């Protein structure tokens, strides 16, 4: 059995660790609220762009934008969104598992893959498996910078428009609630005809699409022309989806980190209680032994 001094040192060490995890939990909780606000703030913009773009395409059905054209898939692009740091539970492990499964599926179908990594964890994974990396962006911080994101994704979008890849996917973690984050592997391009939002419920998306289809007899005045407006709107819509993928992952990261640090703090508290019990028993045994020795010595005298 360890001595009293050794147990006291262990208790002090665990107490210090608990202070750290408790502080990290509080920081993550604060960042989580801000990340959720940013995530939700982007949704109205994406919804309105989707509505206008859907209306324009219904009013101009003869125009087939490359982002909407389905073609035989021989090569694809994959955008993997992960965190830069750890200590966020199984967040990165889960999305990595889903991504590896999809990459294996593409390999079995003889489909070429080129990848873009957002976050150090994803970059490390793609490097280890020898994936073809065409762009990367790490150290994104707590707030996604759209210019940096677009700089990294431009290679993939250009390759799609020029026919070097036939589809573009994004692997990220969708924020459901504070306790639940869901790894998802979504097709970014080509867009579906209804311009469904992959980060919102299917019921809401279908309702919005039905609403647009039921009332498109009116029209806008386009400057310079409808084709140019559709091109610009679809480009912005795809950029918005990419931003949303990163924002969802950041909100999921802070939620997962807060939960992980709370669990660590609770476990540390339990360990401290167990060590305190052992300390008390050891101290009591030592006192009892000393008393027995004193009584034994007195009896011998």
Curated annotation (Swiss-Prot):
Gene3D superfamilies: 3.40.1380.10, ATP synthase, gamma subunit, helix hairpin domain
CDD domains associated with the record: F1-ATPase_gamma
InterPro entries, A to Z: ATP_synth_F1_ATPase_gsu, ATP_synth_F1_gsu, ATP_synth_F1_gsu_CS
Biological process terms in GO annotation: proton motive force-driven plasma membrane ATP synthesis
UniProt keyword Cell inner membrane, yes or no: yes
Any one GO CC term of the record: plasma membrane
Chain ranges passing through the membrane: none
PROSITE patterns: ATPASE_GAMMA (PS00153)
Bilayer topology annotation: Peripheral membrane protein
Biological role stated in the UniProt entry: Produces ATP from ADP in the presence of a proton gradient across the membrane. The gamma chain is believed to be important in regulating ATPase activity and the flow of protons through the CF(0) complex.
Family to which the UniProt record says this protein belongs: Belongs to the ATPase gamma chain family.
Subunit structure comment from the entry: F-type ATPases have 2 components, CF(1) - the catalytic core - and CF(0) - the membrane proton channel. CF(1) has five subunits: alpha(3), beta(3), gamma(1), delta(1), epsilon(1). CF(0) has three main subunits: a, b and c.
Protein name: ATP synthase gamma chain
Annotated source species: Bordetella parapertussis (strain 12822 / ATCC BAA-587 / NCTC 13253)
